[in-house]
Amino acid sequence: MFPHSAILRKETNKKQLSKNKNKMKKMKSLLWGLTTLLALGGFVACDDDNDDGYWSLYPNALVTVKPVDSESFYMQLNDDITLEPANMKGSPFGAKEVRALTNYTRLQEKSENYDQLVYVNWIDSILTKPAITVAEAEAEGLTRQDPVEIVRDWVTIAEDGYLTLRFRAKWEGDNRTPHLVNLVTGVNPENPYEVQFRHDTNGDGQRIWGDGLVAFRLDGLPDTEGKTVKLKLTWKSFSGPKSAEFEYRTRETTTEGGGTAEVRPALILQ
């Protein structure tokens, strides 16, 4: 299912190894269903000795993975809270900053450099890419707008300098044709905080419904200078034009490593 996944393992006896294998089978089975809904990327699971049930198979946070160097990284939980992974060193996604779904357990110990110390049970990157301008979209021929729905969900949110969207569209279902998704800025000269989500089926069939998850970096928008503004999102739905508003504040610090993250979603996106 995840041919490029990296799995961190502890030394264990044969009995524990069998138990962990059964646990991972359950996790992979459940995550297969989850990825067909959310189009997830590079899966990394961290084995432990506790079988705490199915709760740990579900994501309990959407984070930004921020590499510090090759040996360390931290996770931004929202605009204000940072997490230090106690059981991981270098980012499993390399030098790229990415958005990711994760399941973590908060530890009682204190972190010296961040707000919370956590144990990462598993983490899975999502497609992360920069927003583009109207001029860039036209120059690259990214003007097509096939119908799509934005799903009201806890992962559909503007935070930490990103707009993360769960969207719903029709797919052929054979994972052969990538759908193209982009966020375009500068669509309204009178409102620099209005952006447009564009979805291109790229000639894919329209046989089944499926959901995708994508995060767009918003560092090209004007600095809100610490204030919270309304970010307006527009898109072409199956019933006509729609829009939604999000609370948005420019990220206080900008780290290197922008650009498109190399991920391998279950539903193919670009």
Where are these regions (language model features)?
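Hydrophobic helical h-region of N-terminal Sec-dependent signal peptides
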Residues: W32-T36, L40
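First exposed extracellular module after export/assembly in secreted or surface-exposed proteins
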Residues: F2-K23, S56-Q270
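Bacterial signal peptide processing site
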Residues: D47-N50
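Cys/His-rich zinc-coordinating "finger/knuckle" motifs
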Residues: G53
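Bacterial N-terminal signal peptides that target proteins for export
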Residues: K23-G33
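C-terminal motif of bacterial Sec signal peptides marking the signal peptidase cleavage site
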Residues: G41-A45
